[in-house]
Structure formats: C-alpha cells, structure tokens
Regions:
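Amphipathic alpha-helical "coupling" segments that flank catalytic cores
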Residues: 1-178
Length: 178
C-alpha cells in the first residue's frame, strides 16, 4: 500500500494471542476521515478495532490499516470488506465529534469545569485551572517568558476535558486542546 504499518508491540502481542492462525489483511477507509486528528483515528484503529494503522514515509497517517484474520481465507476480500464496514461508523463518530467541537472555542468549555471535581479538598477542575494559570504566569515572569501567554495556556490546559471528543475518546485528553 506504499506505507509502513505501526506494529505496536503490545497490540501485536494481544492480536496474535487472540488468533490461532494469524493472517494479515489490508483494508482502507475513506480519505475524508483524514481531516480528523490522526491521534483520534489511530486510537480508534488500535484501541477499538485492534487494527494496525499505516503511515507514509513522512510519518503521515494513510487511509489504510492492517487487520489480522484468524484463518487463511479463500476470499480475503470478504474479510477486508467486513473490517472496512466495521471501522467506518467508529471513524464517522470521531469525525462528528471533531466537527462539533470545532464549532466552539476551547475557552468556551472553561465554565463547565466548575462541575468536575478535581479532588474534594482541592476543588473543581476549574479551580485547578485558575491555580495552574497563576503559577504559569509567575514562572514565566521569573524566567523572562510572557506571563500573559503562560496564564492563557494554564486557563486552557483542562478545557479539552469537556469536549465531546475527549468524552467519547478519553485517550485524546491533552491532544484535543492543541
């Protein structure tokens, strides 16, 4: 397919343990899904479907994956089509959440953090963000950085927790806020 599969050791061990006669089969998905951050697509492929994503020589995610069948089929295209059909709704979900979250600024989520407990004695995630923002500004000032920019980064640092993408794909925490 012109790329290299990400043969994650942990996933490879898991997949080979699940299959008595492992046979790799390549599959594809619509290129339109590549508009979603690659981390979300990879999380879907590896975490939810146990597929190996394929990357091009520059490290960009391709619209290909490798799945492992449990037999040498006389009709591998049937297995391929079945796996392509299974991943499509999961990728569509990721795309939907990405597009919905894109309709709002990240900062729009900050007030929702008031309803998320960080720790009983330490308050909410909102209060933690306020403390982190103040600390970041102080540190930036002390090292000759931009305190205003550091404060803003601290304020935004937890906002992605309230995005639909992170609610659906918790492993995207810290990535969606970029």
């Amino acid at each position: 397919v012109g790329g290299v599969a990400d043969l994650d050791d942990k996933l490879l061990d898991e997949v080979t343990a699940l299959n008595e006669w492992p046979v790799p089969i390549d599959g594809t998905f619509e290129e339109d899904f590549l508009s979603v951050p690659p981390e979300a697509l990879v999380a879907t492929m590896k975490g939810h479907q146990k597929y190996f994503p394929v990357f091009d020589k520059t490290g960009g995610l391709m619209n290909h994956f490798i799945t492992i069948a449990n037999l040498e089929s006389q009709q591998p295209e049937v297995i391929r089509e079945g796996n392509e059909r299974v991943i499509r709704p999961r990728l569509a979900d990721a795309k939907f959440f990405w597009e919905q979250d894109g309709k709002h600024r990240l900062f729009d989520h900050i007030q929702k953090l008031e309803h998320v407990v960080f720790q009983n004695q330490l308050g909410s995630m909102f209060e933690k963000s306020v403390r982190v923002a103040a600390l970041a500004a102080d540190i930036a000032e002390g090292i000759g950085g931009d305190p205003k920019l550091a404060r803003r980064a601290g304020e935004l640092s937890r906002c992605d927790l309230m995005t639909q993408m992170v609610v659906e794909f918790p492993e995207m925490q810290g990535i969606m806020g970029r």
